[in-house]
Amino acid sequence: MAVKVAINGFGRIGREVFRVAFTNPEVEVVAVNDLTDAATLAHLLKYDSVHGTFPHEVSVDGDNIVVDGKKIKVIAQTDPAKLPWGELGVEIVVESTGRFTEGEKAKAHLTAGAKKVIISAPAKGEDITIVMGVNEKKYNAAEHHIISNASCTTNCLAPFTN
């Protein structure tokens, strides 16, 4: 069964996470939270000035982005504690707004029903910072619920220095 993921913030990082996750059968993106409407988000997903055209059928159905027939709920909520993560069965939230990089603020996603939060930036007060290829073996599912994946610079350089 696929892990249910929600993306909070559908900018450059959020859309790239979606592109990668969509092609992974072990991941199901069930929702996107962003202040922009579904039609604009669908267009930005389909046509990326850096990565090119997303090679899947992308359309809109009300408040949903539809990719290859799969509906992804679009929400526009500024308070993460009010998001319907529990109702949607969200296990992991990718926090990519840049606004909730403190553990205490990111914890609102857990209040909303998510099991884990991955912050796509350096964070303060997170349970652990993980850099793949460097320290991912330190992850403990029972203890670590708010995870930072450090900065893009750290992710580029740290594996070489390890």
Question: For each of these PLM feature ranges, what is it?
Answer:
Residues M1-N162:
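N-terminal Rossmann-like NAD(P) cofactor-binding subdomain of oxidoreductases
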